[in-house]
């Protein structure tokens, strides 16, 4: 059986921390920002953690 491939799009979007958690950037912070409040844009700048319910799917895409 051949090696399983890593999802290259996922590699560009997620980073695994030393403790095994997966970091991701927030969505909705690329364009059409004028109608979004400063408070909302400030919150969207922060790095988020992948939700426990999504961990398995993301881990399989990363194949670490």
Curated annotation (Swiss-Prot):
It comes from the Bacteria. SUPFAM superfamilies: L35p-like. GO terms for biological process: translation. Keywords: Ribonucleoprotein, Ribosomal protein. One of its GO terms (molecular function) is structural constituent of ribosome. Belongs to the bacterial ribosomal protein bL35 family. HAMAP family: Ribosomal_bL35 (MF_00514). NCBIfam families: rpmI_bact (TIGR00001). This is Large ribosomal subunit protein bL35. The gene is rpmI.
